[in-house]
């Protein structure tokens, strides 16, 4: 995922000049992990790395015991309360009728949950559906926090590959983990340009400003004639980074 975000060689990442910290929160296979490791990684990004954005290309299926008092949920909420943007994969469970919401922690209100589209801009069949109801509060989700919020390319994305594990230098992968990184890259570039304006006179981004950035995201999405109606699998539409930046300029009254 780091190559999709920050590669600056033959393949250029979404934000090649980004200052990147990488936290290992999954096991050796990269496919499973423990909640304690995930929550510690999130807190490390917040406390030790002073992160502006925490990008989570991971998730657990809803109903796996993570409630509003779980360590992962608390760690994410601490980050949001501290003015850190959290972007998380919606999940790859679109073909599983038994799973009715995006992954944890993408299902947390302030998090930007990301779905995946294919090269034609159509929603990837495996991209998770979001529920109309917040699983923590039992209340109906409302704009701009309906799940998922946004979709981005996530099918067969080529990136750098660890030469330590294989002779290949590049490989491709598919999933909402990939699309999450593209949204992270877009936001990183936006914060580089408008971060001080978003933070305001106190120089500190707060939860209300995170929410307004999400309003701008929803209003900027390429919604293919959806007229900004939320779709349970596609979100408010497909990422348009340039339009998002322009909408942020409008929402925050930036000259």
Predicted features and spans:
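Subtilisin-like serine protease catalytic core
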Residues: 1-35, 49-53, 81, 107-111, ...
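Hydrolase catalytic cores
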Residues: 2, 21-27, 154-230
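Glycine-rich, acidic and aromatic/proline-enriched surface loops and short helix-turn segments
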Residues: 7, 44-50, 152-156, 219-222
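Substrate-binding/access-modulating region of protease and related hydrolase catalytic domains
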Residues: 8, 25-110, 120, 145, ...
